[in-house]
Amino acid sequence: MMRVRFPLLVLLGTVFLASVCVSLKVREDENNPFYLRSSNSFQTLFENQNGRIRLLQRFNKRSPQLENLRDYRIVQFQSKPNTILLPHHADADFLLFVLSGRAILTLVNNDDRDSYNLHPGDAQRIPAGTTYYLVNPHDHQNLKIIKLAIPVNKPGRYDDFFLSSTQAQQSYLQGFSHNILETSFHSEFEEINRVLLGEEEEQRQQEGVIVELSKEQIRQLSRRAKSSSRKTISSEDEPFNLRSRNPIYSNNFGKFFEITPEKNPQLRDLDIFLSSVDINEGALLLPHFNSKAIVILVINEGDANIELVGIKEQQQKQKQEEEPLEVQRYRAELSEDDVFVIPAAYPFVVNATSNLNFLAFGINAENNQRNFLAGEKDNVVRQIERQVQELAFPGSAQDVERLLKKQRESYFVDAQPQQKEEGSKGRKGPFPSILGALY
């Protein structure tokens, strides 16, 4: 009797959960194409005593497997207290997210401007070509922001256009000829240069694009700023807070906050979801996969082990018969500012080795479905009919049902008791512990 072939995604999950006897290849940190370590994957665009701006390397330069992310970049911004990132615009859409600290974000339009007080968890889309500036008004706390950039002119590349002329860069106004500037401003070039450019007075130029502010300047800027919307997540053009509503998944071991394109116009325009996840030390975000979204995971605080399961690409051979599927495990130890990419349909699991918080951008997010492979709720394996379970698994349907019911938690579980037990038996590495924690 011929056995029925089971859908590939469930096979992947089955292999991941039950260690089905197939060939398994493991790729660790540095050979992992989905892992971008903070220490060697970011390029510093600007840095002085007031802060820095860093740009993550292009995803498709890291690996051809990330080609579908060629149009996206990750930007990290940090600034000291009482500072401002000077006015500029870029040929890219930005989705800005506040990781820690406070900020005043001002968006400048042709005939108006809008200023907003931002707090941790606040997000805001900045459309391409919008002039904006960013203040850290706090007296003691640093500001930390992550931005997803989507360039509009060149795939994977964008430019910042600063109005100010500093020691770090020229004002884009300096690109125009003198007579054009004189006609445009109806003034002599000497006056334009003295007031706006300072080409011959370098000693008066700022040291860079992040500069200090006085207490009085901050007080004036703060007076004009509005608070972000914490009552609604559906704002079309104002900041919204990712963590202001109840988490979509929550128990004693973790919390999962998310806003999808269906709930927010700014995210709908970009086809992106935003997630912020807290996991307690020693706990596990259970194995699951996203149906169509590619997830860019950024570690904000803490450390974690992550395991991702895919199918190894088969080599072209002259033989006509099919090769057996070879499962490949990608594993990495993640820490603050590290980035990890999770392709659509690839099952993965996150084990927090300290209290953990990470942010996730979901690309191609509309109508994405999250499918858990273990746990009591939202478990795709539990929805498979008994007759099909008999064909798909070596155990009986009763055995499968009994196994799946052993895990009474959902979404997050405590892996520490299992890890201690495995440690006492002399086993090494996180994978056996992760498997044992599931059932």
Swiss-Prot record:
Family annotation (CDD domains): cupin_7S_vicilin-like_C, cupin_7S_vicilin-like_N
The keyword ATP-binding belongs to this UniProt entry's keyword annotation: no
Signal peptide feature range: 1-23
Pfam families: Cupin_1
Ranges where the Cupin type-1 domain occurs: 34-193, 240-401
Major localisation: other
Domain of life: Eukaryota
An example Gene Ontology CC term for this record: protein storage vacuole
InterPro entries reported for this sequence: Cupin_1, RmlC-like_jellyroll, RmlC_Cupin_sf, Seed_Storage-Functional
SMART domains from the UniProt entry: Cupin_1 (SM00835)
Family: Belongs to the 7S seed storage protein family.
Subunit structure as annotated in this protein's UniProt entry: The alpha-, alpha'-, and beta-subunits associate in various combinations to form trimeric proteins.
Function recorded in the entry: Seed storage protein. Accumulates during seed development and is hydrolyzed after germination to provide a carbon and nitrogen source for the developing seedling.
Protein name: Beta-conglycinin beta subunit 2
Gene (UniProt): CG-4
